[in-house]
């Protein structure tokens, strides 16, 4: 079974491998040992559950045709259980998200849009569910702003969705903001997205966005800044009435 008790099936085996001093499954003399092998291929569901638990039961007949059987021990008597305990293979959960927000197109005058792309990648080893993206937008002076649209789910790699984001897959969201005169006066906008979701144990997993530019010396959790340079100009006309 998996660590949560869900039924599983071995990929192969148990298969007879060898017997000491010629012992076989057909005839196992006292003091002799038979060896069997088996294997299981790890699945994402097993990782999400935290691993696998396994028990083998050996059975045979004595000379009086009575059934003789024994349930397996895990071979580790230091665990406090010296007989008939599951062989447990634990797989530790390492949930993690990586969020990047970039401005894919920008304008410089009132009414122009700033379009954003937000990517959320599952960089851990367990599936993350119920992914959401929250956004914090301010002008360059720190004044609070609100996105014109989004964040809106756009796509997921290999069928990934906000409801279920497997390891290694990425969700893409879009958002936009329409430039105002106040934003131009402030010198631009600063934006941060925070992606959150739940791991299989229902723990919250979150990550604050990086701007996608590691050349700026800040490789993680830095704001996406869109600067709008001030262009001061006057046009004065004087006419004689």
Regions found by a protein language model. Give the residues of each.
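Exported/extracytosolic protein signature
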Residues: 1-241
């Amino acid at each position: 079974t998996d660590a949560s008790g869900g039924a599983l099936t071995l990929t192969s085996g148990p298969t007879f491998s060898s017997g000491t001093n010629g012992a076989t499954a057909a005839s196992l003399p006292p003091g002799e040992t038979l060896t069997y092998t088996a294997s299981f291929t790890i699945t994402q569901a097993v990782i999400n559950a935290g691993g696998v638990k396994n028990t083998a039961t050996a059975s045979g007949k004595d000379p009086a045709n009575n059934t003789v059987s024994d349930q397996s021990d895990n071979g580790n008597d230091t665990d406090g259980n010296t007989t008939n305990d599951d062989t447990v293979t634990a797989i530790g959960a390492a949930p993690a998200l990586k969020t990047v927000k970039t401005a894919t197109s920008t304008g410089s005058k009132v009414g122009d849009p700033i379009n954003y792309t937000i990517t959320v990648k599952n960089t851990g080893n367990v599936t993350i569910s119920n992914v959401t993206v929250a956004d914090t937008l301010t002008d360059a002076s720190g004044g609070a702003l609100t996105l014109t649209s989004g964040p809106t789910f756009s796509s997921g790699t290999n069928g990934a969705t906000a409801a279920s984001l497997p390891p290694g897959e990425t969700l893409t969201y879009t958002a936009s903001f329409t430039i105002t005169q106040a934003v131009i006066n402030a010198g631009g906008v600063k934006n941060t997205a925070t992606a959150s979701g739940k791991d299989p144990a229902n723990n919250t997993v979150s990550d604050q966005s990086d701007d996608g530019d590691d050349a700026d010396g800040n490789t993680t959790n830095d704001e996406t800044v869109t600067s709008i340079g001030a262009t001061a100009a006057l046009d004065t006309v004087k006419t004689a009435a």
